[in-house]
Amino acid sequence: MKNTPPLRKFLLLPFAVLACAAWAQTPPSAEPAPVVETPAGPPLPALPAMAWEPPPLQPFSATYQAFYKGKEAGDATMQVTHTGGNQWRVDMQVVGRRGFASVLGLNLEQSTVFDVRNGVYAPLSQSTVRKGLFLGKKAVGTYNWETGTAQWTGDVKKDRAKPIPLQPGDQSALLLNLSLMRDARPGVAMHYRYVELGKVRQHDYQAAAQTENVEVGDLSYNALKVYRTNGGNNETILWIANGVPTPVRILQREDGEDRVDLRLIEYQGV
């Protein structure tokens, strides 16, 4: 199986999204866990709300194939690591391997360190690194819950380097993806405040009333569709499957046309 990433814009998706996603690398383990693959088969029956089970927070590594405007663009990897106690880390790396992105050598990395407080994911720090032939930028942010502010340093605009007042439940882009995985239920509306790189945005999502059969490459998933409702002409759609710790597909559309499309091709426990 392979994995593929979108371009810079995907880093601001909640799993966006994605996306997300931007996604990360991990030190190799002595014995890698077995890869989980779902064999293709006949369409799976839709699940009622009572049968839906959101995936628990657990360590994993996932590989995505990414398309940009319908053309293969590169690779994306996402990893969640338990660093001890209530603290976790989520990483994403996107590498451009096709077309213009390959020529420029685009390499995007994001990470968020967070802890779990009464079931809520609270970001502690966040970093974004963008590399390329004519590009090299890094920004690091700290979410200080004692002072109630978040602030970024590095390659950020002056007006985005000021402290931002925090509110309970505030999320980074990568953390928002995990929160959607935790909170999504058939028919449920979800509301989050996104705070990252000196910006604050409201993100509202709606889950479909029931699951649907989704084909991702050679695999078939019984997945719940979750979509953003306040993005205007920028649509973000995720499909979440029972038993899979990460979205099986993330699609971003602009003005009715597909822009970034991430398709899960492999995942494994860490």
Which sequence ranges carry the predicted segments?
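Bacterial N-terminal signal peptides that target proteins for export
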Residues: K2-L12
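Short, hydrophobic/proline-enriched secondary-structure or compact coil segments at domain edges
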Residues: F10, A150-Q151, V248, Q252
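Acidic, serine/threonine-rich low-complexity disordered tracts
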Residues: T26-W145, R182-V270
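Hydrophobic, well-structured mid-protein blocks that either form specific transmembrane helices
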Residues: G132-A173
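Short, structured interface segments that constitute the first stable element of a domain
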Residues: R160-E196
